[in-house]
Amino acid sequence: MTPALTPNPLLRRDIPAHRELMDAGGQWVVEQGADPAAVVREAQQHDVAALSVTGKDLSFLAELPELEHLRLGDAGDIGPAASLPRLRSFEAVGWDGGRIDATGWPRLQRFAVGAPPRGGGVESVYAHPTVEVLGLNRFAGTELTEVTAPRLRELRLSSPKLESLTGLEAHADTLEVLVLSGVPRLRDLSSLAAMTRLEVLGISSARGVTTLDEVAAARGLRLLDLGDQRGVESLGPLAGHPSLEYVLFQKTADMSLAALRDLPRLRAVGGYRSRDWTPDLSTFPDLVTFAEEDDVSRDYAVLRLRY
């Protein structure tokens, strides 16, 4: 008889989010088309705390109130997930119907949704008192004043409407990772100057961001990823930055790398391949040339996978 649940063999202890799942007994995957009764029976038999579901039917969740970690594909009615008071992490591609109410998850720490439906209730997470990691696609605001979660340490966001980072300064004492992608209207980055604990910043597809003056004002940055950020005029504003260790970038208008010579803690770069750079890109330590076990690569991975 084919089991309804199988353990996920791809978890890696060096990835913090995976490590949490492993410490909870591993993540169990609901096989496509599995009988809901069998899912419940096997989950109870294995004391499952972390579940990954790809199917639409979530009705069986009501019988598994001990779940702490839930990952969903493109689900149907999200309602049964409300019956999980011990939930600490929630990840979903999206769902067809129903609303979430994150106040029913008082222990929630991680939340990430790829394609939330309109009216799906994701706003109930914005001020959640225990959320530390927040990933939002299709964020509807023009600024970040709605996001007030007091323990926020990592924010990953894409939004066709975001124009300003106003409101981000409310997280100056906690936020360490900020990743912005698909933000074509974003122009105002002035709030970065207040982010004294921010160590990782990624910006991509922000056509309105052409200067790094406001980026350079975030003086605690260790990793700056402009890997898909075209149209930046110059890396010049980064010169003299006291803490940058890794810089990833596309071509700039002035094609000058002189500022990288003036980064006292620089360990590696990842740059757009071109012979037009001055000085030559090959004169800088290239991230891809370091072996996986090298400290430079390991420390980079730790920053990228902080949470």
Regions found by a protein language model. Name each.
Residues 3-62, 66-79, 86-210, 214-233, ...:
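Concave beta-strand-loop units of leucine-rich repeat
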